[in-house]
Amino acid sequence: MNSIQKTRGLRIVLAMLMAVSGGVLLAAHSSRLTVSASDPGGGDWPMWGGTPDRNMVSNMKGIPISWDVQKKTNVKWVTALGSQTYGNPVVAGGQVYVGTNNEAPRDPKVKGDKGILMAFRETDGEFLWQAVTDKLAAGRVNDWPYQGICSSPLVEGKILYYVTNRGEVVALDTEGFRDKENDGAVKDEKLNGERDADVIWKFDMMEEVG
């Protein structure tokens, strides 16, 4: 790849990062995902901050200001996530997406420390599929243990964009392999069951732009 291509690629990736990875700035430890019982009224929250304005303002009415997970007060459903969860969940097209680690494994074949992006059904919290990313060999130098996926996803139509713990910008089909189709240019996913992510394309920033 020549310098012009690298520069162009870097501009594209930087634009993506401005949209996708802002959630790292608002990191918080969590081991559960809680969804409000308030009717969303069709109002998606498809990116960090809700809209490109990043003003964190919802146009929904009657939003609860208190929750009790144990008593299920103003809580629609609760599901376990990994031991650390950074960034923010996003909601789009009837699904909830959130990055975490593999400390609450959904697939017994996936063992050890991984970066995990999970998809759930918005109405009842049913687990739908997950994207799995191996840790970088350098460990703490580039990929701190158990931090998992730190970026907040961005959803546009039927495509989800996020940044992995390996510094890759990835586009996924929001249906995963549940639609029994392998979409996009990537056809060699190691995990391609019904509950696995369908990768459309991937851009490795560490390899391509240094």
What role is predicted for each listed range?
Residues M1, A19, A28-H29:
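Intrinsically disordered, low-complexity segments
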Residues R11-I12, D39:
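Hydrophobic alpha-helical segments and their boundary regions
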Residues G23-G210:
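Noncatalytic, solvent-exposed loop/strand surfaces
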Residues R8, L14, A28-H29:
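Intrinsic structural disorder/low-complexity segments
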Residues V13-V24:
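Bacterial N-terminal signal peptides
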Residues M1-L10:
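N-terminal secretory signal peptides that target proteins for export/translocation
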